[in-house]
């Protein structure tokens, strides 16, 4: 299932951050889950679509697409 949300914050140096979903939950995102070529980063407030999978520490985003 594909969801949409806004990037709550993303640390480009460490390569991870969180996406805020409409239901108020935050989903972990790692740079390796961002689609596209080149340097993979997200900007705070940027809208994205993504799927959710269960990671070792809870839900995490995969197939993240910048909208």
UniProtKB/Swiss-Prot annotation:
Keywords: Activator, Cytoplasm, DNA-binding, Transcription, Transcription regulation. Pfam families: CSD (PF00313). Coiled coil: none annotated. One of its GO terms (biological process) is regulation of gene expression. It is found in: Cytoplasm. Its main location: cytoplasm. Residues 5-64 form the CSD domain. Homodimer. This is Cold shock-like protein CspE.
């Amino acid at each position: 299932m594909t969801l949409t949300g806004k990037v709550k914050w993303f640390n480009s140096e460490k390569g991870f951050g969180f996406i805020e979903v409409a239901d108020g939950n935050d989903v972990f995102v790692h740079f390796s889950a961002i689609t596209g070529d080149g340097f993979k980063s997200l900007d705070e407030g940027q809208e994205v679509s993504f799927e959710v999978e269960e990671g070792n520490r809870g839900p995490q985003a995969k197939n993240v697409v910048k909208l």
